[in-house]
Design a protein with these regions (language model features):
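Conserved signature/switch motifs of ABC ATPase nucleotide-binding domains
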Residues: 20-23, 41, 73
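Catalytic Walker B motif of ABC-type/P-loop ATPase nucleotide-binding domains
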Residues: 46-49
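A short, surface-exposed alpha-helical micro-motif characterized by mixed small hydrophobic
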Residues: 87-89
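C-terminal boundary and immediately downstream tail of ABC-type ATPase nucleotide-binding domains
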Residues: 109-140
Length: 140
């Protein structure tokens, strides 16, 4: 188990931090450490609820890169996010909720290209896309 944890810490860029206290880590490092703790449990599905909401922009990238790696490794995830470019790049499905009810459930290209509901159209308009990002264009 310890070998696996050390390998995962290395994979998310936290080598040498295995003995650090939470107060010694940045927000992004804390999020990545939490992801490593979850991965050590070998879950069938990982749930992320606004995992980047309280982070500074430079920390957001760190966390999204880890989630991108998980997506590339075909990890099953349910991600609640307002990071629309990222969602478009990594999602197999997009589900738009309003007051706890599903308003749209479709693939990313259809959701971003031809939203069905007025709610989705207004939601996407609020992001003012200037171009269509390519898969993984958001995270370098």
């Amino acid at each position: 188990m310890e070998e696996e944890a050390l390998a995962l810490l290395k994979r998310v860029g936290l080598s040498g931090k295995e003995n650090a206290y939470p107060r010694q880590l940045s927000g992004g490092q804390k999020q990545r450490a939490a992801i490593v703790r979850a991965l050590c449990m070998h879950p069938e599905i990982m749930l992320f609820d606004e995992v980047t909401a309280a982070l500074d922009p430079e920390m957001v990238r760190e966390v999204l890169e880890v989630i991108l790696q998980l997506a590339e490794n075909k990890r099953t995830m349910l991600i609640v996010t307002h990071e629309m470019q990222f969602a478009r790049a990594v999602a197999d499905r997009i589900i738009l909720l309003d007051d706890g009810r599903i308003q749209e459930d479709t693939d990313p290209e259809e959701f971003f290209g031809s939203p069905k509901t007025e709610l989705a159209k207004r939601f996407l308009k609020s992001f003012e896309y200037t171009r269509s990002p390519k898969p993984y264009d958001y995270v370098i």
